[in-house]
């Protein structure tokens, strides 16, 4: 159940990103594809891949948040 929720959340994250963050979006899509493969495998190696791809999501989201706050800071 939790794996399904994570997968739905990651797909939503990919589609809701602005177009201007193309490289970040492609990185998330690459990690999403590795996450889907690991769900199919569903082994301890797959669990490690899940953790790594979720760490990549969090890292990318933090980067996007930092960039947006930086732009906001310079626009004021």
From Swiss-Prot:
InterPro entries from the UniProt entry: DUF5488
Protein name: Uncharacterized 8.6 kDa protein
């Amino acid at each position: 159940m939790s794996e399904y929720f994570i997968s739905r959340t990651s797909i939503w994250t990919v589609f809701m990103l602005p177009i201007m963050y193309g490289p970040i979006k492609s990185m998330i899509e690459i990690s999403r594809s590795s996450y889907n493969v690991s769900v199919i495998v569903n082994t301890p190696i797959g669990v490690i891949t899940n953790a790594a791809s979720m760490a990549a999501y969090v890292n990318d989201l933090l980067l996007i948040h930092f960039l947006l706050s930086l732009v906001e800071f310079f626009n004021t």
